C-alpha cells in the first residue's frame, strides 16, 4: 500500500523541482541511489523521489539502507524493509554491517566508520548502475556539521562542506526551507523509524543538535541563509553532459551479459535490466513481467518475451537481448538504386549492380563450402534474435541467395557470402541514422 502525498506537500515538491532546475538534466538521465535510514529526513527524500517518479520526471531510483548493528533492534529493521518493500515499487538494496566492531578495529568513531562504509558501498552501487548518490542532508545538518568540524580544528573548508553536488553525491533537501520541512512533517502521516542512537548524548553531533543548535536558533540564526551564503546552486560539470554524449545515438538493441545477471540478487538484477532499458529510452519492467522474465532466465532455455515496448530474447547460449519495438532493426530495409546503397538498422553498404536486396523467404538456402545450408540455421548459429531474422536483408542474383548481410545487424560480424565470386564493397556508417 502506497503512502498518500497531500496537496500541500505536492505544491512544495513542485516548487523544489523548479529550484533544482540546474540538476534536471542529471536527474532525468541517470538513476538515483537513495540513501534511506528510515528517519524523518530520508523519509522526505524518499517521498520526493517517489513523487518525481510518479510525475514521470525521472527513471526509477534504487533504495539503499544500511543496518549499522547499533540499534540491536531486529524487529525495527524488519519493519523498515517491509515498509519500503510494500510502499515503493523500486529496487532495494538492504545491507547489514557490524559498525561498532569495525570502528574499534579502525580506531575511528562510530559516525566516521558508518559514514565511510556507507559511502564506499553507495559509490560501488552508483558506479555499477551509472547513477548518482542522493542523501537527505539539509541546512540544519549543515549547521551541525560546521560546528562539529570547527570543534575538531577545521578551517575555512568547514564552511564549504556539504555542497549541492560533489563526488557524485546530490543533496536536494537543501532546496527545502526548514519551514517547508516542518510543514511536510506535520501534514503527512508517513512511517518514521528513528534510530535510538540519535537520542544518545554519547555522540558529539547529538550534543550539538540537542544543546547548541537550539540556543543559536533562539538567538536568530537562520540555517537556510547561512548555507546559501557559502554555497551556490550550479549545474554540475560532468562528462555525462558533454556535447558528444548529449548527441549520442540510441542503439537499436543492447545485450546484457548473462553471467553478470546470474551473479546479481533479484533486486539488483531488476535494477540492472531497468537501467539498460532506460538507456534505450524505455520504461522499467513491471514487477509481474520481471517475475516472468526471471523464471525464463532460470530455465536456461531459449525464449522470446515481449511487453508493450520491448522484445526480450535469449538463446540457450547467448546473452540477453533487449530490442525496442521501434528499433530500426525491426523495420524493412531501404534501397537507393541510383547509388546502389542498402540501408538498414542505422548502417548502410554499397552493393554490386548485379545483386538485388531482398528479405529472406522461408526455407531459403545459401551455397557455402560446397554445401547448401538453410539460412535459418545460419542465423540460429550466429545467435541473431528471432524477431530480427525476418527483417535481415539478403542479396540475391540469378534466383539464388548470394549474401546474408550480417554486417548490417552488427558491424563486428562479417557477411556470409555464397560460393561464387561476389564483389562486396566496404560497409560505412550512415551519419545521423
Curated annotation (Swiss-Prot):
GO terms for biological process: tRNA modification. ATP binds at residues 37-42. Keywords: ATP-binding, Cytoplasm, Ligase, Nucleotide-binding, tRNA processing. Its main location: cytoplasm. It is an enzyme of class 6 (ligase). One of its GO terms (molecular function) is ATP binding. It catalyses: cytidine(34) in tRNA(Ile2) + L-lysine + ATP = lysidine(34) in tRNA(Ile2) + AMP + diphosphate + H(+). The keyword DNA damage does not apply. Its EC number is 6.3.4.19. It is found in: Cytoplasm. Pfam families: ATP_bind_3. One of its GO terms (cellular component) is cytoplasm. HAMAP family: tRNA_Ile_lys_synt. The N-terminal region contains the highly conserved SGGXDS motif, predicted to be a P-loop motif involved in ATP binding. Ligates lysine onto the cytidine present at position 34 of the AUA codon-specific tRNA(Ile) that contains the anticodon CAU, in an ATP-dependent manner. Cytidine is converted to lysidine, thus changing the amino acid specificity of the tRNA from methionine to isoleucine. Belongs to the tRNA(Ile)-lysidine synthase family. This is tRNA(Ile)-lysidine synthase. It comes from Leptospira interrogans serogroup Icterohaemorrhagiae serovar Lai (strain 56601). The gene is tilS.
Amino acid at each position: 500500500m502506497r503512502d498518500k502525498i497531500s496537496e500541500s506537500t505536492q505544491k512544495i515538491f513542485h516548487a523544489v523541482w523548479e529550484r533544482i532546475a540546474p540538476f534536471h538534466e542529471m536527474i532525468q538521465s541517470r538513476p538515483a541511489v537513495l540513501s534511506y535510514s528510515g528517519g524523518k529526513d530520508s523519509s522526505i527524500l524518499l517521498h520526493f523521489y517517489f513523487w518525481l517518479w510518479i510525475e514521470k520526471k525521472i527513471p526509477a531510483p534504487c533504495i539503499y539502507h544500511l543496518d549499522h548493528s547499533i540499534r540491536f533492534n531486529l524487529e525495527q529493521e524488519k519493519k523498515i524493509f517491509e515498509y519500503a518493500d510494500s510502499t515503493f515499487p523500486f529496487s532495494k538494496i538492504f545491507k547489514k554491517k557490524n559498525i561498532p566492531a569495525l570502528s574499534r578495529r579502525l580506531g575511528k568513531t562510530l559516525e566516521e566508520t558508518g559514514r565511510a562504509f556507507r559511502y564506499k558501498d553507495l559509490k560501488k552501487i552508483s558506479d555499477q548502475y551509472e547513477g548518482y548518490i542522493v542523501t537527505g542532508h539539509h541546512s540544519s545538518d549543515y549547521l551541525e556539521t560546521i560546528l562539529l568540524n570547527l570543534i575538531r580544528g577545521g578551517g575555512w573548508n568547514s564552511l564549504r562542506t556539504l555542497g549541492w553536488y560533489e563526488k557524485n553525491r546530490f543533496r536536494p533537501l537543501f532546496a527545502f526551507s526548514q519551514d517547508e520541512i516542518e510543514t511536510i512533517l506535520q501534514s503527512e502521516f508517513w512511517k518514521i523509524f528513528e534510530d535510538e542512537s540519535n537520542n544518545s548524548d554519547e555522540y558529539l553531533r547529538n550534543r550539538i543538535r540537542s544543546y547548541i543548535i537550539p540556543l543559536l536558533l533562539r538567538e536568530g540564526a537562520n540555517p537556510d541563509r547561512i548555507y546559501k551564503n557559502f554555497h551556490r546552486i550550479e549545474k554540475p560539470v560532468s562528462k555525462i553532459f558533454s556535447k558528444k554524449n548529449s548527441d549520442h545515438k540510441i542503439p537499436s538493441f543492447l545485450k546484457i551479459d548473462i553471467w553478470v545477471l546470474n551473479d546479481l540478487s533479484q533486486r539488483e538484477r531488476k535494477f540492472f535490466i531497468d537501467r539498460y532499458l532506460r538507456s534505450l529510452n524505455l520504461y522499467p519492467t513491471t514487477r509481474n513481467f520481471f517475475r516472468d522474465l526471471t523464471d525464463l532466465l532460470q530455465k536456461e532455455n531459449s525464449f522470446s518475451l515481449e511487453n508493450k515496448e520491448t522484445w526480450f530474447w535469449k538463446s540457450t547460449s547467448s546473452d540477453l537481448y533487449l530490442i525496442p519495438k521501434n528499433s530500426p532493426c525491426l523495420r524493412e530495409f531501404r534501397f537507393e538504386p541510383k547509388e546502389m546503397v542498402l540501408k538498414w538498422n542505422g548502417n548502410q553498404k554499397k552493393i554490386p549492380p548485379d545483386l538485388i536486396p531482398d528479405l529472406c523467404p522461408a526455407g531459403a538456402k545459401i551455397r557455402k563450402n560446397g554445401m547448401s545450408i538453410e539460412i535459418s540455421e545460419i542465423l540460429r548459429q550466429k545467435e541473431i534474435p528471432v524477431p530480427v531474422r525476418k527483417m535481415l536483408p539478403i542479396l540475391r542474383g540469378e534466383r539464388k541467395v548470394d549474401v546474408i548481410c550480417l554486417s548490417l545487424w552488427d558491424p563486428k560480424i562479417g557477411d556470409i557470402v555464397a560460393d561464387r565470386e561476389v564483389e562486396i564493397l566496404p560497409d560505412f556508417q550512415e551519419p545521423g541514422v
